[in-house]
């Protein structure tokens, strides 16, 4: 089916979320660069559902966190330029396209910020507890992560129904 190709204008809040996201990505890399040399050679590389470290590896593996977060951020940023390719719960018509595209790109914008915050939090906790005898993210981490991801989707879906 035909879907109009429309450039979605950004609101002031959308622009603020974009700036916050870019700032978070840059802060993530800077924080890691500042703290990398102080890390022990072996650090936690995986955490179980309860937040306890259950996998260890070379400290260079921590670079995967900002790398993956950056790739996801860039990929969603690029994808957001093509809202007509997304899946929508209702049919897209010329009359509702701008509204639907705006809602979807806004949700994706918030989600990419949430992803960067989650990955940054994992890196922060890994650095903070790397020298600990019992490194952990904390039992709160998984529930908070799920709340951030699904809460963002639910809230943005709910307020725009």
Predicted regions and their residues:
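Select subsegments of transmembrane alpha-helices in polytopic membrane proteins
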Residues: 17-21, 75-77, 105-117
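Active-site and channel-lining beta-strand-loop segments
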Residues: 32-64
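Conserved small/polar residues in nucleotide/adenosyl-binding loops
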Residues: 159-161
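Hydrophobic alpha-helical transmembrane segments and immediately flanking/interface helices
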Residues: 128-150
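Alpha-helical transmembrane segments
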Residues: 57-73, 142-149
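Alpha-helical transmembrane segments and their membrane-interface junctions
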Residues: 114-132
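Membrane-helix interface/capping segments
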Residues: 78-95
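Alpha-helical transmembrane segments and their helix-start/interface "positive-inside/aromatic belt" motifs
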Residues: 9-24
